[in-house]
Curated annotation (Swiss-Prot):
Name of the featured protein: Fumarate hydratase, mitochondrial
InterPro entries listed in its UniProt record: Fum_hydII, Fumarase/histidase_N, Fumarase_C_C, Fumarate_lyase_CS, Fumarate_lyase_fam, Fumarate_lyase_N, L-Aspartase-like
Complexes and interactors: Homotetramer.
HAMAP family membership: FumaraseC
Length: 509
């Protein structure tokens, strides 16, 4: 095969050098991140791992992953919670939007178009969800979200390198810091991604869900407008109202919920990008912040603008605390509405029984035929969770020390969780409960006719004291109001029939 002994000698020497290099690499103190076990999908390497470096040294990185050494190091240092505590994917995809916008602006300011275009294409893949499997980090990391920002930078860098025919982990020709993170800091990119993610979740999940619930309750209010029932205050009998009026109260609560959430959004639309490390904008160009905000707005269709004050945008998260407060108020409304509906539907024979709720599934593993108000229970649990989330957001928001709040990942995790839960629960509650609610008119009429509080209609005619005596007498004797009134001689039958008319007791005269 070889033409001379000299050629054979050179081949043997090269083979020896390769084997020596392999032994040297194996001898190094490099190890994969604990818990990272991936099915190897060969990308730019024929080995299961590649060697990457950060300022602390070398680490093994799975060859089928686009992230790099800093991401691996984070998985080693923050083994908290496992996969269920990973950074919300909405934040990762928001980062994709931001990194694309930044690359486009940096291109305008002189970044090599080839590099900028590759970054933008890779960022598109992050935003679309194509690269979701390359983001393993948990929420519980540095409070600025630095590890997640670098996770995004590394993934976009390596994917862009691959697109350009380079070697993964080489940082050439696309560097995660110098190019992907150009004119940026974790301190301004993470809060920017927080706001993008929160605004999108509100618009795409929460507000449509609340509107669906609002419309369904409004339809029921119209359907029930002519059904007169007894009201209740302090859980005791009160004067009548229509079932439609009762549901109308729920409609207004949801209407206000939508308005409160929308009212909080202008502050969420303000983006921290361009503030860099402490809000001064060090290492950015004049106009960078405004241009990035404009690009993000164009990419999302939402009215994002650059934050009026970058120091506030980095050091505080009052905008998200405000949004969380609105979500907390929504949860309060949902708790009241769901509780009312399940109590009005209690029974079927030993409860209030004024509403007939849809039967969706068996309710008991021991009591045959039992059906429970499961959608109401799910909604009230969601409401409780959102209230708890707001406590966490409040604590996190109040701990912005000096120039940087370092509770960012926890804050956005809870805000996104609240928005998603309320949006999803509103749709579930609507489709599986509200639209199928029917009025039990027989039960409603029976309870109303037996109520002593109809006596309130007599106040203008015979006075409070005499009306109260009629009610107490009827209760003591077990008689009707009419029987007690006639027995006491305070009015005649014709007067009672004229004055005590539930349909005339539904509003001012």
């Amino acid at each position: 095969m070889y033409r001379s002994a000299r050629s054979l000698h050179r081949f043997s020497a090269s083979l020896s050098d390769l084997r020596a290099a392999q032994r040297s690499i194996k001898a190094r103190n490099v190890c994969p991140a604990p818990g990272l076990r991936h099915q190897t999908v060969r990308m730019a390497s024929s080995e299961a791992f590649r060697i990457e470096r950060d300022t602390f040294g070398e680490l093994k990185v799975p060859s089928d992953k686009y992230y790099g050494a800093q991401t691996v190091r984070s998985t080693m240092n923050f083994r908290i919670g496992g996969v269920t505590e990973r950074m919300p994917i909405q934040v990762i995809r928001a980062f994709g939007i931001l990194k694309k916008a930044a690359a486009e602006v940096n291109k305008d300011y002189g970044l090599d178009p080839k590099i900028a275009d590759a970054i933008m294409k890779a960022a598109d893949e992050v935003e679309s969800g194509k690269l979701d499997d390359h983001f393993p980090l948990v929420v519980w990391q540095t409070g600025s979200g630095t590890q997640t920002n670098m996770n995004v930078n590394e993934v976009i860098s390596n994917r862009a390198i691959e697109m350009l025919g380079g070697k993964l982990g080489s940082k050439d020709p696309v560097h995660p810091n110098d190019h992907v993170n150009k004119s940026q800091s974790s301190n301004d990119t993470f809060p920017t991604a927080m706001h993008i993610a929160a605004a999108k979740e509100v618009h795409e999940v929460l507000l449509p869900g609340l509107q669906t619930l609002h419309d369904a309750l409004a339809a029921k209010a119209e359907q029930f407008k002519d059904i007169i029932k007894i009201g209740r205050t302090h859980t005791q009998d009160a004067v009548p109202l229509s079932l439609g009026q009762e549901f109308g109260g729920y409609v207004q609560q949801v209407k206000y919920s939508i308005a409160r959430v929308k009212a909080s959004l202008p502050r969420v639309y303000e983006l921290a990008a361009g503030g860099t490390a402490v809000g001064t904008g060090l290492n950015t160009r004049i106009g960078f912040a405004e241009k990035v905000a404009d690009k993000v707005s164009a990419l999302t269709g939402l009215p994002f603008v650059t934050a009026a004050n970058k120091f506030e945008a980095l050091a505080a998260h009052d905008a998200l605390v405000e949004l969380s407060g609105a979500l907390n108020t929504v949860a309060v409304s949902m708790m009241k509405i769901a509780n009312d509906i399940r109590f009005l539907g209690s029974g079927p024979r030993s409860g209030l029984g004024e509403l007939i709720l849809p039967e969706n599934e068996p309710g008991s593993s021991i009591m045959p035929g039992k059906v429970n108000p499961t959608q109401c229970e799910a909604m009230t649990m969601v409401a409780a969770q959102v209230m708890g989330n707001h406590v966490a957001v409040t604590v996190g928001g109040s701990n912005g020390h000096f120039e940087l709040n370092v509770f960012k990942p926890m804050i956005i995790k809870n805000v996104l969780n609240s928005a998603r839960l309320l949006g999803d629960a509103s749709v579930s509650f609507t489709n599986n409960c509200v639209v199928g609610i029917e009025a039990n008119t027989e039960r409603i009429n029976k309870l109303m006719s037996e109520s002593l509080m109809l006596v309130t209609a007599l106040n203008p005619h015979i006075g409070y004291d005499k009306a109260a005596k009629i009610a107490k007498t009827a209760h003591k004797d077990g008689s009707t109001l009419k029987e007690a009134a006639l027995k006491l001689g305070f009015l005649n039958e014709q007067q009672f029939e004229e004055w005590v008319r539930p349909h005339d007791m539904l509003g001012p005269k």
